[in-house]
Amino acid sequence: MNTIKTGLLTTLLLACLCMLQAVQAESTITIDSAWIREAPPATSVLAAYMTINNASETDQQITGMDSPDFRSAEIHRTVVEDGVAKMLPVSGLDVAAGGSISLEPGGLHVMLFDPQRPLREGDTATLVVHTASGAAISVQATVVRKTGDDAGHDHSHHHH
């Protein structure tokens, strides 16, 4: 009987420790300047950008993203081969202790597939950033119309 109680107590303690690690990761990872590029209403693929900050003293890994406002979301990296821009999926992002990673046009970004509703300039959508420790950090991204130098990065013509 004591063996069962000890085993149960150990399991409970480990579960609490895992939850504490997830809460710590969530409180040390912050998201700034999240935005989604506005696209024509019939577009099924949009792109999101943001800065991911790690205020902790240990490296953190971003393992993926999703959104209740899209069928799916994937982290991609833009690579130019033979003059053609290609979007390649990235399995995860390492954010150094005390560091940050910028997801921006022409580099790392989030591809958002099949919006649940048309998104116009000024609308917001929820993006969820997942970490290796199990944390899920939600952020509201504002839809922004592309302008100036940024106008040339239209994802509807890139190869995935």
Over which residues does each language-model region extend?
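Bacterial N-terminal signal peptides
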Residues: 10-19
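Compact, glycine-rich, soluble single-domain proteins
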Residues: 26-160
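Sec/Tat signal peptide C-region and signal peptidase I cleavage site
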Residues: 20-25
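Positively charged n-region of N-terminal signal peptides that target proteins for export
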Residues: 1-6
